[in-house]
Amino acid sequence: VYYLCGTHEDTFDAFIAHAGIFNEEHMYMTTEEMWFPNFDNGGLHETVIDPRVGTKDAPVGPAGDGVTFGGIKQGGSPWSNDPKAVRHYELSPHKLVTNWHTPLMVIHGGMDYRVPVDEGMAAYNAAQMMGVPSRLLIFPDENHWILKPQNALLWHREYFKWLDSWCK
């Protein structure tokens, strides 16, 4: 959603981002789930796994090439020269903030370790600094999904209220 905020050319009247990624480089270093940033961002098609992985002889630290850790090539890292990773980080939504002008509601769980709440707070702060009408809704006791019944009701109420405010 944050990428669309900077590229949509007035296609949308409003945006709602739930647990969105604002700064891809920051996200890479703060998520508790490294599979997605490593393999989705350029690592999967280039993954080289040391045959010792999973054995008592498995490597435990970085190899001499500087891009392998524990026998798995880190193709999706911000410091990777992998073309897919380079393009991915060049298109990080935080680099498009100067194009933001469409109202944005940011929703995030305060205990989300997959996409840390900092991503939502940073996007909200960027929208505020750009003068974009924006709202921040954080559920301090929820994680990546808003599952508690009362919180889910509030999530839906605020979601539709935001759309009603900007899309009529």
What are these regions (language model features)?
Residues 1-168:
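Active-site-proximal cap/loop segments of hydrolase catalytic domains
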